[in-house]
């Protein structure tokens, strides 16, 4: 099958960037279809670390085409800065190998202001956003007042769009005794970047359909993870877009038949606030944090850490129609005597084999665990199944049994080549 969708099965930070980079060697095109520069994908090539926020992970391969779809909230200044920082490292990003949908809604300073303002107003009930303006940008898109990339080409249209945008944002700012924004300030902000960003503007949906007819191999690269999905995640502690596989169609404009691959860590992490049934607020969590170097790529915040939650991952598999799994960061568990997997929940005298939608229940769930002996052997950098300890493989097989789909790849380090194939795609 020519098309592959890659999605995260937890709360993000599963290692999707490395897997997209690895699989893109045999692809032609990689498409980002949701989120914004609140996502962070880290790729290590020959000990050089690349941290990507908006750009698809295939941008590091010179012969691949990278596309930012209409489902992405676009911070134009951040994109140009990311392109320029890659050029310093010898990576050439140009309008031949990068295309941006003309329908992308633009993130502006008013969006970042609003997000920070409302996070501050929430006090102890903060969501824990990255303050990148993603949520308010999506709000404006749904409210039909967003400024889109295509609007930058027409002065009259742009002026009308800015008027509509500011009538809303300034009404809120006045109500909260916050300084209003002048139209000239927004126009200047846009004009500073428009010439550079318009070089990449394309009718992405049409180009993707042409590519599909030509038989090109396309990878759709998801950001965040299933339980940050606005509909299916741990609401309200979620992101502002759909992160499950079906969003790849809406966020790119391409209807496709595709293999859907999920990426999951061998344990669980989460950045920010919200329910986390298998979280370990103890020495185990501290060890996972320190060994796994669990700091957010974008926020640089400490990630909360816990045991693998098979209930969550199985639910994510079903939500996205995942047919196979990539399991990452198994090497982080090398030193543990005992390893646990969450296999169910208890609440109010009732057993759950799924994550209930209610936040009031989610935050009180008590995990049910199954224990496994650790392998106490270094696996970092291994590239062959024969090199893997028997107890590690028992752990992998149990996860397969619990989530109901096969694990076909294992990642044993951040490096591009440290991947073990268990099954063919």
Curated annotation (Swiss-Prot):
The UniProt keywords, alphabetically, are: Cytoplasm, GTP-binding, Ligase, Magnesium, Metal-binding, Nucleotide-binding, Purine biosynthesis
What does this protein's record comment on cofactor binding? Answer: Binds 1 Mg(2+) ion per subunit.
Looking up PROSITE patterns in the UniProt record yields: ADENYLOSUCCIN_SYN_1, ADENYLOSUCCIN_SYN_2
SMART domains xrefs:
Adenylsucc_synt (SM00788)
Q: Provide the binding site for GTP.
A: 12-18, 40-42, 303, 329-331, 411-413
Q: In which pathway does it act?
A: Purine metabolism; AMP biosynthesis via de novo pathway; AMP from IMP: step 1/2
Write down the superkingdom of origin.
Answer: Bacteria
Binding site residues for Mg(2+): 13, 40
**Subcellular localization, as worded in the UniProt entry:** Cytoplasm
Q: Where does substrate bind?
A: 297-303
Q: Where are the transmembrane segments?
A: none
Tell me which residues bind IMP.
13-16, 38-41, 130, 144, 224, 239, 301
Give the protein name, as stated in the record: Adenylosuccinate synthetase
């Amino acid at each position: 099958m020519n098309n592959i969708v890659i999605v995260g099965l937890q709360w993000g930070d599963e290692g999707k960037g490395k897997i997209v980079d690895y699989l893109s060697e045999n692809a032609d095109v990689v498409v980002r279809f949701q989120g914004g520069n609140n996502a962070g994908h880290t790729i290590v090539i020959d000990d050089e670390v690349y941290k990507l926020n908006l750009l698809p992970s295939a941008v590091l391969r010179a012969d691949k085409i990278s596309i930012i779809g209409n489902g992405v909230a676009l911070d134009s200044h951040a994109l140009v800065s990311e392109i320029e920082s890659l050029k310093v490292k010898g990576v050439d990003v140009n309008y031949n190998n990068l295309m941006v949908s003309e329908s992308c809604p633009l993130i502006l300073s008013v969006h970042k202001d609003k997000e920070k303002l409302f996070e501050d107003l929430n006090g102890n009930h903060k969501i824990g956003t990255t303050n990148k303006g993603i949520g308010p940008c999506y709000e404006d898109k749904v409210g039909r007042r967003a400024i889109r990339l295509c609007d930058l080409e027409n002065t009259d249209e742009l002026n009308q769009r800015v008027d509509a945008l500011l009538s809303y944002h300034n009404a809120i700012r006045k109500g909260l005794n916050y300084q209003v924004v002048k139209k000239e300030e927004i126009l200047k902000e846009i004009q500073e970047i428009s010439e550079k960003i318009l070089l990449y503007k394309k009718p992405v949906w049409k180009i993707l359909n042409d590519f599909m007819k030509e038989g090109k191999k396309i990878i759709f690269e998801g950001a965040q993870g299933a339980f940050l999905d606005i509909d299916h995640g741990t609401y309200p502690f979620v992101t502002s877009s759909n992160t499950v596989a079906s969003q790849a169609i809406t966020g790119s404009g391409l209807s496709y038949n595709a293999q859907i691959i999920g990426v999951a860590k061998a344990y669980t992490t989460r950045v920010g606030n919200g329910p986390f049934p298998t979280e370990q607020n103890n020495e185990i969590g501290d060890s996972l944090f320190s060994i796994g170097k669990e700091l957010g790529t974008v926020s640089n915040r400490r990630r909360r850490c816990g045991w693998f939650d098979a209930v969550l991952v199985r639910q994510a598999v079903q939500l996205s129609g995942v047919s196979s799994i990539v399991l990452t960061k198994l090497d982080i568990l090398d030193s543990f005597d005992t390893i646990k997997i969450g296999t169910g929940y208890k609440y109010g005298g009732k057993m759950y084999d799924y994550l209930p939608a209610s936040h009031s229940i989610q935050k009180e769930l008590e995990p049910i665990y199954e224990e496994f002996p650790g392998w106490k052997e270094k696996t970092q950098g291994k590239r062959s199944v024969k090199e893997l300890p028997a107890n590690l493989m028992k752990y992998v097989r149990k996860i397969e049994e619990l989530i109901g789909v096969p694990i076909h790849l294992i990642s044993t380090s951040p490096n591009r080549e440290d991947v073990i194939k268990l099954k063919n795609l």
